[in-house]
Amino acid sequence: MKRSVLVIALSSLLLSPLAMAKDLQVVASFSVVGDMVKQIGGDHVQVTDLVPPNGDPHEFEPTPKDSKTLAQADLVVVNGLGLEGWLNRLVKASGYKGSVLTASNGIKSLKMEEDGKTVTDPHAWNSMKNGIVYARNIVDALAKADPDHAADYRKQGDSYIQQLQQLDDYAVKAFAAIPKEKRKVLTSHDAFGYFAAAYGVHFLSPIGYSTEAEASSQTVAKLIKQIKQEHVKTYFIENQTDPRLVKQIADASGAQSGGELYPEALTDSNGPAATYTAAFKHNVDAIAGSMQ
């Protein structure tokens, strides 16, 4: 009799809503938005990044495994602004019918002329004020997808947004202390437009918004001349791009290495930029430090 009561009690526990609850399965297009979801979602979410750490979201090629991962998601979070050109065909191939959050919704985008076309700069997260917009969008999407834990998402989101605001203030103060004529650096590609607009830094690069673009010999020669004329003394490589071209330009112009930046891909957990906030602070410290 006692054994029967015990079996019934265990069965009731296993069938209870608490025991049956599962984490929200979220697929993120790349590591930056994936980390934001992890920070806000906490223990209630399982996040899979399609583009792995140190991976280039511009050149990513989805696999059948990615299609299967997407098909099992409860929510998909992407950057938008044209970053994930491969997304639509992946969604179609996977048969995913759920919600897709574009984390950049509400951002005032930047544009430039590239190869005779007007293109949108997708790297909005490199301004921390934009990062706050991303975070708010993610909070709302998680709360809608998993209303049972909405209060937790909003509490964790508020705390996270405070961190982002503090980092924005940190960056503003760091660059305000540097004379404007010194705020110039060379990078691999034009991923810092929003950062430049927010913090008053001038970035030079051989290629535009996408790492898939190629620089012509005329562009390279013109850039080398500009670097010399403007006395740009430091160049940076990026963890997700081929460094050879920017090193070639630096050698020809006399610019010295300032190290590595993380504008659109986080590192693995052992690296210096394993989270969005760590990557941003690293970039601020490295860039500002090179101008001293």
For each of these PLM feature ranges, what is it?
Residues 8-9, 19:
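Cleavable N-terminal signal peptides
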Residues 1, 21-22:
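Absolute protein N-terminus
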Residues 1-7:
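Bacterial N-terminal signal peptides that target proteins for export
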Residues 22-292:
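Extracytoplasmic metal-acquisition and chelation regions
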